[in-house]
A protein has these predicted regions:
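Extended ligand-binding clefts on enzyme/binding-domain cores
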Residues: 1, 5-10, 162-216
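Aromatic-rich carbohydrate-recognition surfaces in CAZymes
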Residues: 1-109, 118-140, 153, 193-196, ...
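An acidic- and aromatic-residue-enriched active-site/binding cleft used to recognize and process polar
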Residues: 28, 38, 77, 101-102, ...
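Short beta-alpha connecting loops at secondary-structure transitions
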Residues: 111-120, 141, 180-186
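Residue position in alpha-helical solenoids
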Residues: 139-142, 166
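Acidic, serine/threonine/proline-rich low-complexity intrinsically disordered regions
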Residues: 141-150
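Short amphipathic alpha-helical segments with heptad-repeat character
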Residues: 150-153, 177
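Short amphipathic alpha-helical coiled-coil/interface segments
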Residues: 152-164
């Protein structure tokens, strides 16, 4: 559910929103969003999640959609558009929470880096998850819901601590590991390890990891 960037969003807001609306309409009742939602090959997905590619969800589709909606609000100041998608936003967050395995506070599952199999606890999505929580906090502030703000802040602190403890090896974020932190793959330096850091800074939400670690 990737936007074509700041220019596309800023100057073609309605076109950008039409894409976000399509992904929202194709959201499964469980809260996940598919990569190929229907319009990619054969036609539009229908409202309520009926699409030709059932059950092909990826974690970062939900995260990307959430982040884009908040970025739209911050670019336009349109609270009503954000509120119109609030039910879907909460459903997508509930889905992401459901993907947390026992002993972990970071969702586990496939992502759009789908060309080969990745470790369960994956440095790319760990950072994106932290940015998703930054976005959820911004949603709470935008609509005046302190419970969302508090939930997002507490979850961010917990998940960030876990990511640093399990994935940071003193030089870079390891490719990934098992949910309990075992079998950490320090022999692979994955180029997408700071994707969440980039997204958060681009959106103006600050760092998801300490800057001394990022610069390492």
């Amino acid at each position: 559910a990737a936007s074509w960037g700041a220019f596309y969003q800023k100057f073609f807001t309605q076109l950008d929103r039409s894409e976000m609306d399509i992904f929202a309409d194709a959201m499964d009742p469980e809260g996940y969003i598919l990569h190929f939602i229907g319009h990619y090959y054969v036609g539009m997905g229908t409202v309520g999640g009926r699409v030709p590619t059932e059950k092909g969800w990826m974690l970062d589709n939900a995260s990307g959609w959430i982040i884009q909606l908040v970025k739209d609000y911050e670019q336009t100041g349109d609270t009503e558009y954000l509120k119109a998608h609030l039910t879907g936003l909460k459903r997508a967050m509930k889905f992401l929470y459901s993907r947390m395995p026992q002993g972990s506070t970071i969702p586990v599952g496939p992502t759009t880096y789908d060309d080969f199999t990745h470790p369960p606890l994956y440095s790319y999505y760990a950072g994106v998850w932290l940015t998703t929580l930054k976005a959820y906090e911004a949603i709470g502030k935008a609509i005046g819901d302190e419970s969302i703000v508090k939930q997002a802040q507490q979850q961010f602190a917990t998940s960030q601590k876990e990511a640093l403890e399990k994935l940071w090896n003193g030089r870079f974020f390891a490719y990934g590991c098992e949910p309990d932190g075992s079998k950490r793959l320090d022999n692979v330096l994955f180029t997408g390890q700071l994707a969440g850091q980039f997204l958060s800074r681009y959106c103006g939400w600050g760092d998801v990891y300490p800057m001394d670690i990022v610069k390492a």
